[in-house]
Amino acid sequence: MAFPHRLDAPELPDFSMLKRLARDQLIYLLEQLPGKKDLFIEADLMSPLDRIANVSILKQHEVDKLYKVENKLTLSSNEQLCFLVRPRIKTMRYIANLVNADKLAGRVRKYKIILSPQKFYACEMVLEEEGVYGDVSCDEWAFSLLPLDVDLLSMELPEFFRDYFLEGDQRWINTVAQALHLLSTLYGPFPNCYGIGRCTKMSYDLWRKLEEEEDSETKGRRPEIGHIFLLDRDVDFVTALCSQVVYEGLVDDTFRIKCGSVDFGPEVTSSDKSLKVLLNAEDKVFSEIRNEHFSNVFGFLSQKARNLQAQYDRRRGMDIKQMKNFVSQELKGLKQEHRLLSLHIGACESIMKKKTKQDFQELIKTEHALLEGFNIRESTSYIEEHIDRQVSPIESLRLMCLLSITENGLIPKDYRSLKTQYLQSYGPEHLLTFSNLRRAGLLTEQASGDTLTAVENKVSKLVTDKAAGKITDAFSSLAKRSNFRAISKKLNLIPRVDGEYDLKVPRDMAYVFSGAYVPLSCRIIEQVLDRRSWQGLDEVVRLLNCSDFAFTDMAKEDKASSESLRLILVVFLGGCTFSEISALRFLGREKGYRFIFLTTAVTNSARLMEAMSEVKS
C-alpha cells in the first residue's frame, strides 16, 4: 500500500538544529528585558512559536501573561511589555497607540519590540512618525525556517505570494537569501544550483553575495545536500489551482492544515470536542497514507484496523508472564495506533460526506477536461452553473482561473459574460479581485484578433532568433500569456494511457491527479535533474517566459559523497502544495533521490484565491 522508502535512499539531515537555534535566539532576546514581562504575540506567529517554544518555556524566562495583538488596545498591568510581531505598518501603529496611551496617562513602562523574521526600515519610520521611537527598543528574531516534518521546512510567510506576485514587493527576497545562507552554513555548500523565475533569480543573486562575503565559513565543509532547485510559484499556477486527491492534500483542502497541524472537529473525533493533531512522520498511520490517492486510503485503514484487532486478540492465549510483557511493551503503542486510526477513519468519512455533497466527481471531470483541452464549452457551462448556484465564491473563481490559464486567456465574450455573472451572483465588491487576478496573470482576456501573435511573427522575420526570443518574451509579459497547452505537449504533462490508470500501482507522478496530469513544476524539476542543466529545454523556458539559471561548483561536487548528491532541496517561492510534495516523493523513490522541501508557506487553491481577493471572508 504505502510506498516504502528505498533501502538505498540517502539519510536526511537533522533539521531539529534549526528549532534549537530559533529557540535560543528568542530566549536571548527575552532575557534582554530582565524581570517579569507581558508578551504580546501577533496572531500568525502563535502557531510557529508553539512549535519552537511552548508556554512553559516562555514562563521559565519570566513571561507573565500572554496577549494576542488585536485591533482593540489590551490593558496590561505589567511594567514591562514585549511585542513579538511581524514587520507590518499596521502593527507598528497598534504598538505606537499603546505607548502614546500610556504617555497620556502618565505611566512609565519599558517596551521591547521583537520583529520576525526581520526588521524593516519602514517599521522604524512609523514609530518615529508616531513619536515613540525613543521609547521602545527594536530587535530582530531571524526565525525564517520552521521544520514542519523530517523533509519539509516552511518560512511561514503566506503573505509572500501576494506581496511579490501581485504587488511586486521585493522585501522578502532578503529573508529568502538569509534562509538559504543559514542552510548552507549549517549543512555545507550546495554544489549544484538550478532555478527558474524572476523572484528566484533575485533571491539566488543576493544569496550568492552573502556567500561570497562569508565564504570562509563554509570553505572546506563537505556538502550534505548535493542539489538545490529554486522555483517561482507563477511558473506553474495550474498545479496549485487543481483539486487535490492525495490524502494529505485533501485533508488540507477540507480542514486546513496550519503550521503542520490540523483541528479535527466533533464530526471527526466522534466526541463533543475538537482535537488539534500534529501531522508528520511521527504519526505512523498518517505517514503510510499521506501520499496515497484517496481511493486507496479506506481499504488500507480497514486492513490496518483488522491487523490491530488481531494483535489485541493475541492476549487471550497468554500466560501471566506473556501478559506482563504485552502490557509493558506493546499495549501503549497499540492504544496510540488505535487512537490515530480512529481519527484518520473519521477524517476520511468527513471528507467523503463533504465531497459527495459537492458532487466532487463532476468537478474533477471538469478539471481534467480543462487540462486536456476537451469539451471547453461544456466546462464553461459547468462554471456558469457553479456561479448561478452560488457555490463558494472562491471555488467559482478558482475554476475561472483554471479555464483562463489552460486556454491562454479567455475570449473577450466569455471573459465579460463570466465576470458579469460572477459579480451579479456574489456581489460588486469582488470587482477589485478581478483586477488583481488580471495583474497576476491568473484570469486574463485574450487580445482581440490575437494581435500580439501577428506582431511576434513579423518581429521574428526581421531579427535573429535570439533577439526575437527576447522581444517575444517582452510581448508575452505584457499579455500575461500562459502557453499552457504548448508547454503541456512539450513536457508530456497529459499521460496517454491504454485502459484505466492503476492508482494502486502508479507508473508516474500523474497519480497525484488521478492519472490525468503530471504537475508542471515537478516535471520541470525531473527534466533538469535528468540533464543536470537546462540544455534542451530552451523552448519550454521561452514559453514560460522566465529567467533560468544553472550553476555547478566542481570543487564542491568533488567533496560531496555519492549519498549527498542524491539529496535535493527544492525551494518554492510563493508556496507549494501537498500534491507537489507527494509527486516529488514518488519521483525520489523511482529514481533513488530524496527530496527536501523549503517553501515560503504551504498553499492550496483556496489560499491562492484568498490571497488575491479584496473581499475578506
From Swiss-Prot:
Name where it's found: Late endosome membrane; Lysosome membrane; Early endosome; Cytoplasmic vesicle, Clathrin-coated vesicle
Keywords associated with the record: Acetylation, Cytoplasmic vesicle, Endosome, Lysosome, Membrane, Phosphoprotein, Protein transport, Transport
**InterPro entries from the UniProt entry:** Sec-1-like_dom1, Sec-1-like_dom3a, Sec1-like, Sec1-like_dom2, Sec1-like_sf, VPS33_dom3b
Gene Ontology CC terms? clathrin-coated vesicle; CORVET complex; cytoplasm; early endosome membrane; endosome; Golgi apparatus; HOPS complex; late endosome
Cite the record's tissue specificity text.
Ubiquitous.
Q: How does it sit in the membrane?
A: Peripheral membrane protein
Its predominant location is membrane
Presence of keyword tRNA processing: no
So which domain of life are we looking at?
Eukaryota
Q: Name one GO biological process term.
A: lysosome localization
Signal peptide coordinates? none
* Molecular function terms, GO-annotated: protein-containing complex binding
Q: N-acetylalanine-modified residues are where?
A: 2
Q: Give the free-text PTM comment from the record.
A: Phosphorylated on tyrosine residues.
State the protein's purpose: May play a role in vesicle-mediated protein trafficking to lysosomal compartments and in membrane docking/fusion reactions of late endosomes/lysosomes. Mediates phagolysosomal fusion in macrophages. Proposed to be involved in endosomal maturation implicating VIPAS39. In epithelial cells, the VPS33B:VIPAS39 complex may play a role in the apical recycling pathway and in the maintenance of the apical-basolateral polarity.
Which PANTHER family would you find in this protein's record? Answer: VESICLE PROTEIN SORTING-ASSOCIATED (PTHR11679)
* Self-association and partners: Interacts with RAB11A and VIPAS39. Associates with adaptor protein complex 3 (AP-3), clathrin:AP-3 and clathrin:HGS complexes.
Question: So what family is this one in?
Answer: Belongs to the STXBP/unc-18/SEC1 family.
Q: Under which name does UniProt file this protein? A: Vacuolar protein sorting-associated protein 33B
By which gene is this protein encoded? Answer: Vps33b
